[in-house]
């Protein structure tokens, strides 16, 4: 089972945090909460819907943007999209074009789109970790 304050679905635990942080601060904060925790990643549309629902329930629908664990990592000439927890990018809900390196969920309408934002911007966020098997 997930620790107190965390929501679960399948084998993962999720928890939104209301304190606004930069992307790096939020990622570091997640890793300090639970072993193996990171900013939230989403592997499919169903998980994205669940994440949005948990965020909206916790923020009484007054939330517009929240950090997710997606980031553009520059590797020499190539730029790679990577989840901070290392999970594969099997599902994307990107709103192009992207100008910045860090991604957030824009919760304004329907299924939230993922936008890039200045990594130094401070936003609320959600952490996620996988339960040991």
Swiss-Prot record:
SUPFAM superfamilies: C-type lectin-like (SSF56436). One of its GO terms (cellular component) is extracellular region. It holds the Pfam family Lectin_C. The keyword Zinc-finger does not apply. It comes from the Eukaryota. One of its GO terms (molecular function) is toxin activity. Keywords: Disulfide bond, Hemostasis impairing toxin, Platelet aggregation inhibiting toxin, Secreted, Toxin. It is found in: Secreted. Residues 1-129 form the C-type lectin domain. SMART domains: CLECT. Belongs to the snaclec family. Potent inhibitor of collagen-induced platelet aggregation. It acts by binding to the integrin alpha2A domain and blocks collagen binding to integrin alpha-2/beta-1 (ITGA2/ITGB1). The gamma/delta subunits mainly contribute to this activity. Heterotetramer of subunit alpha, beta, gamma and delta; only the gamma and the delta subunits are disulfide-linked. Alpha-beta heterodimer and gamma-delta heterodimer associate orthogonally, giving a cruciform conformation. This heterotetramer may covalently dimerizes thanks to the gamma subunit. This is Snaclec rhodocetin subunit alpha.
């Amino acid at each position: 089972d997930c620790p107190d304050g965390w929501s679960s679905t399948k084998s993962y635990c999720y928890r939104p945090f209301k304190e606004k942080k930069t992307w790096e601060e939020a990622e570091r904060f997640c890793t300090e909460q639970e072993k193996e925790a990171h900013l939230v990643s989403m592997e499919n549309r169903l998980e994205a819907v669940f994440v949005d629902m948990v965020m909206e329930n916790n923020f009484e629908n007054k939330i517009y943007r929240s950090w997710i664990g997606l980031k553009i990592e520059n590797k020499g000439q190539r730029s790679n999209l990577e989840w901070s927890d290392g999970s594969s990018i099997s599902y994307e809900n990107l709103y192009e074009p992207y100008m910045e390196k860090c991604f957030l969920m824009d919760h304004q309408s329907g299924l939230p789109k993922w936008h890039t934002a200045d990594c130094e911007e401070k936003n609320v966020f959600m952490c996620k970790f996988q339960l040991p098997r």
